[in-house]
A protein has these predicted regions:
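Conformational switch/transducer regions in large eukaryotic molecular machines and scaffolds
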Residues: 28, 702, 724-727
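Metallocofactor- and cofactor-centric catalytic cores in central/energy metabolism, strongly enriched
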Residues: 288-289, 296, 542, 737-743
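Short connector loops/turns at beta-strand edges and beta->alpha or beta->beta junctions
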Residues: 37, 41, 457-461, 541-542
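Charged, amphipathic alpha-helical regulatory modules used
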Residues: 2-122, 742-747
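Contiguous, well-ordered alpha-helical segments that form the cores/surfaces of helical PPI scaffolds
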Residues: 529-542, 562, 723
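Conserved catalytic cores of very large enzyme subunits
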Residues: 104-525, 546, 550-709, 713, ...
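Long insertion/accessory domains within large nucleic-acid-processing enzymes
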Residues: 709-748
Length: 748
């Protein structure tokens, strides 16, 4: 909507407005003049009409005000400025008619808002939706269908399902009610799949019974089918463990030995047991390779009903199975998975690139982290894989035992279950799984009910740096989040097991009967529900003037985090629901929060003056700090984020410096529960460049991706892989997240 303004260097920049569709367009003063003129021309006005010069003056006044702010404005903000300017002139009749004119248009827009958004999705004109999820391609028909359904669900959620104050707080960026595009239906967030029960005891997929697999390769195929079905029945991520596949390696081993023994005997070949075992092992290795390849390719080529490949994590933990042949078989699977991921997968041009899924998590433990350890060779492979493909991520067995008393994976990206308390309480097998063992704690088959996030930056800025006021605001906002979380919980109450048989009846999460409700699984700590938080870095900086890496900043940050945990403990004790604190992985919402903050508080240096805010407890991406210090300092916050946390360090190309990667892994093992290394893995299809594709500004100030070798800016002709939050994105990002990616400083 603007023309141009001068920055501090007297350089001319065009000013822009963000339309309701999310599209960024040049601001035109004549649109303001035209809207005011319509109100001014109404028959009801006899006196107090505005002259054409006065109308032009108002438009110029708004232009100057917007110019001085140095940021983009939304259409609604511009209209607010017009109303204020009209009232300031004393021409109240014109102002009232303009407000009425605006309200009438708003009502007409309201009646067709969903229709317009759906049309903009189909026509590929909705910038917000196009960059909402970095693993969804908005051009594809099936993805568009999911987005269309999501727009209706958002509307229905805001208008009918949520209390007005919660919906308004969400729209204003005070809190974030996650996944409202799925809230119309009774779906949960993320989970740990009880693959062992399904594979060992049989399951059903789309009404067809599946017997326990008779080979490793079949088990891999069935696993891929289960993952796809689960992904279509929930909106969050899922995790399965390779430990549940490991027993089928020996099933294949015995099957191969039996077949070879028969075949060799039939042709009269004499052989020893060792020779037979050697031949069988060679064939078995090929089957393991084939099975792992099946999982890799099926999981990135299958598409769930939510318009993307399943958001799935594969867990690799050697101590999850007993010592002996079973552990050796698990090690073989892990080794094979690493080798195949290092190779990558071919894109349609036949070039090996980095796949987004499955995300891999490898546990660092006392027999794989030191040179000379029995399984050190796997950690070396993991380091090479990280340097090339940005996975696996790492959990420290040592630190997780200290924090939770056990080792188990996160659900998808970073959401962790609370330690099992229902087994200790003697509540028993409420999910009726066929592999329940009352002598062990249970994690696979449990899930998360959903997330609501508090914007810590807004709470801080709303206080005006008054600490007493800050804590009052925090208490109010936390109770708002609590009520929003209750909405999530109550939405799931009464859900029939029939809505998702793969989850509730056939073993992924439970084996309930048709017609039964899932209500018992929502209490007693079987599932969790998450209080998310974002912007701790900016919150602390605003209130203290320091980073939370400083002693004073850290002390205040710890108090903020403790207040979140205290709230969750209070709610949990009162309701018998496991509320937990979750470090929110804002993706597109980081841009929304930033824009809402700028609208409410203007540009505050190092607080609201960027188009993103910092995820969870993370140190600001613009802060200079080395990798080891970053991990050490952030490790202090992970115990205060028990429902979800992950830390990362940004590193250059490490493929020729694996010892440095190993050094970081050793530091992770000794220091922090859960961490990852971010590298770059890009490819330009125009010139074949393999390296880091750059983020640059185009002539309008928009951030775009450019090949440093040939200058290609066509996103359809490049493969860019970046860590979005806790997972890898490959479909590009909105302007806020892109700016955050650009600003990330290297830590090595």
């Amino acid at each position: 909507m603007y023309n141009e303004h001068l920055d501090g260097n007297n350089e001319v920049h065009e000013l822009y407005v963000i339309k309701r569709s999310g599209k960024r367009v040049v601001f035109a003063k004549e649109k303001i003049e035209k809207a005011i003129a319509k109100a001014n021309a109404e028959e009801g006005i006899i006196r107090n009409r505005l002259s054409s010069d006065e109308i032009s003056s108002i438009a110029e006044q708004i232009y100057k005000s917007a110019s001085n702010a140095g940021r983009d404005y939304s259409v609604e903000e511009i209209q607010d400025m017009v109303e204020d300017a009209l009232m300031d002139t004393g021409k109240h009749s014109v102002a009232r008619l303009y407000i009425k004119y605006r309200a009438n248009h708003a009502e007409r827009r309201k009646l067709t808002a969903v229709d317009k958004k759906i049309v903009s999705i189909i026509d590929l004109q909705n910038e917000e939706v196009k960059q909402e999820n970095s693993n969804k391609n908005p051009v594809v028909t099936s993805v568009q269908r999911d987005y269309m359904a999501g727009e209706w669900s958002r509307y229905f959620t805001n208008e009918y399902l949520l209390p007005e104050d919660i919906a308004r707080a969400h729209q204003e960026g005070i809190i974030h009610f996650h996944d409202s595009d799925y809230f119309a239906q009774k779906e949960h967030n993320c989970d740990l799949i009880n693959l062992e029960d399904m594979l060992q005891n049989g399951t059903a997929i789309s009404g067809t019974y599946i017997d326990p697999p008779k080979s490793f390769s079949t088990a891999c195929t069935v696993t891929s089918q289960i993952v796809a079905q689960v992904a279509s029945s929930q909106y969050g991520g899922q995790t399965f463990t390779l430990s549940h596949l490991a027993p089928f390696v020996d099933v294949s081993r015995q099957k191969i030995r039996k077949r070879l023994k028969t075949s060799l005997s039939e042709v009269g070949i004499v052989f020893t047991d060792d020779q037979l075992a050697g031949l069988a092992e060679k064939e078995l290795i090929q089957e393991v390779k084939s099975g792992c390849q099946t999982i890799q390719y099926q999981l990135i080529t299958l598409q769930s009903t939510n318009g993307q490949a399943p958001f799935v994590t594969t867990f690799m933990y050697l101590h999850e199975v007993p010592e002996g042949q079973l552990r050796e078989d698990l090690a073989l699977i892990i080794k094979t998975m690493f080798e195949q991921r290092i190779l990558g997968v071919k894109n349609k041009e036949g070039i090996y690139v980095t796949p987004a899924f499955p995300k891999l998590i490898y546990v660092l433990q006392d027999d794989n982290i030191h040179e000379g350890d029995k399984y050190y060779y796997l950690t070396e492979l993991a380091a090479k894989c990280t340097a090339k493909r940005m996975v696996p991520d790492y959990i420290s067995e040592k630190k997780m035992f200290e924090l939770k008393g056990e080792v188990y994976p996160c659900m998808g990206c970073r959401s962790f279950l609370t330690p099992d308390r229902f087994t200790d309480a003697g509540i028993g097998n409420i999910a009726r799984s066929h592999n329940y063992d009352e002598s062990k704690h249970k994690y696979y088959g449990r899930f998360n009910q959903g997330v609501v996030t508090i914007n810590l930056v807004d709470a801080a800025c709303s206080s005006g740096k008054n600490f007493d006021k800050f804590w009052d605001i925090m208490n109010e906002r936390l109770e708002l989040c609590h009520r929003a979380l209750r909405c999530r919980h109550e939405r799931l109450l009464g859900t029939l097991s029939d809505v998702a048989p793969i989850l509730w009846q056939d073993g992924a999460l439970a084996r309930l009967k048709p017609g039964e409700v899932i209500d018992p699984l929502l209490y007693n700590g079987y599932s969790t529900i998450s209080l998310g938080y974002a912007g701790l870095a900016e919150c602390v900086y605003y209130m203290t003037g320091e980073s939370h890496t400083s002693p004073d900043g850290r002390a205040f940050a710890i108090k903020v985090m403790q207040s979140l945990n205290d709230a969750c403990t209070k709610w949990k004790l009162a309701e018998n629901i496991d509320y937990s604190v979750y470090g929110t992985p804002l993706e597109s919402t980081t841009y929304k929060f930033a824009k809402c903050l700028q609208k409410r508080f203007g540009m505050i240096p190092n607080v609201t003056d960027h188009n993103y805010i910092t995820n969870s407890y993370h140190i600001c991406v613009r802060e200079d700090i080395n990798a080891f210090d970053k991990l050490s300092k952030e490790a202090e916050f992970q115990p205060l984020s028990p429902g979800g946390c992950i830390s990362y360090v940004e590193v250059p190309n490490m493929q020729n410096n694996i010892p440095a990667v190993i050094a970081l892994l050793k530091h992770i093992y000794n220091t922090i529960v859960y961490a990852e290394l971010n590298t770059k893995s890009d490819y330009c299809e125009c010139c074949g460049f393999d390296g880091e594709i750059q983020i640059v500004e185009d002539t309008s100030g928009k951030l775009v991706w450019e090949c440093p070798n040939c200058g290609n800016r066509d996103q359809t002709k490049m493969h860019v892989t970046r860590r979005t939050c806790g997972y890898i994105g490959t479909q590009f990002w909105n302007q806020g997240r892109t700016a955050e990616i650009r600003d990330r400083k290297l830590h090595l």
